[in-house]
């Protein structure tokens, strides 16, 4: 196992319901990557954008070589094939680790999944299949999965995929909520990269924001 190397996989919703938040998503993602370029240790970044289909924007790229996300990269459209995006990414990363030399397998692997709506377009993966895949990687290899959801019950939805309650959070799907998401995600990634145990408090700021501002509506 390669010490101080973290595999980070972002699965980002770009379905039509994200319309109006393109610049907030782009800005938040770029700010997070900039912070991670200056963090301790090494990191490989994979970014999967999904709507009806999945697009691999980055495939295990050194974080220091990641170029800023642009509006040409992130254009919203289509429906929400969330399960296919998650299942495909786990299959890809899992196969790479399986056939790599043991000393080349990253010390940590972390998936960050964000969506603002319910699954409605996957063709290849089911809830049960994705749940089996996630639980296997968590138990066998200690992979981390974070799930951030808007306009759904994020905790309940995550549980269908085998993601624990303390790794799921509801967020406000607006400019402020999106910016906060990426701030908190960056903090969580930094903790994992430094081998600091990720407790349930990682999501406290998002929880508080959701409860405070959600009650106004």
Locate the predicted segments by residue.
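Acidic, low-complexity intrinsically disordered regions
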Residues: 1-217
């Amino acid at each position: 196992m390669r010490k101080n190397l973290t595999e980070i996989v972002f699965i980002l919703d770009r379905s039509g319901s994200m319309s109006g938040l393109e610049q907030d998503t782009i800005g938040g993602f770029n700010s997070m990557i900039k912070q991670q370029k200056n963090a301790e240790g090494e990191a490989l970044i994979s970014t999967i954008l999904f709507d009806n289909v999945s697009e691999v924007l980055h495939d295990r790229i050194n974080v220091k070589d990641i170029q800023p996300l642009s509006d040409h990269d992130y254009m919203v459209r289509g429906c929400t094939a969330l399960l296919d995006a998650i299942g495909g990414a786990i299959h890809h990363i899992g196969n790479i680790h399986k056939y790599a030399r043991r000393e080349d397998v990253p010390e940590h692997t972390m998936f960050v999944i964000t969506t603002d709506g319910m699954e409605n377009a996957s063709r290849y993966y089911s809830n049960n299949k994705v749940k089996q895949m996630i639980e296997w990687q968590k138990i066998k290899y200690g992979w981390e999965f974070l799930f951030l959801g808007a306009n759904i019950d994020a905790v309940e939805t995550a549980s269908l995929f085998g993601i624990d309650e303390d790794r799921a959070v509801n967020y406000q799907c607006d400019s402020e909520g999106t910016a906060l998401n990426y701030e908190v995600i960056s903090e969580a990634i930094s903790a994992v990269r430094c081998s600091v145990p990720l407790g349930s408090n990682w999501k406290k700021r998002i929880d508080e924001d959701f409860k405070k501002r959600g009650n106004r509506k």
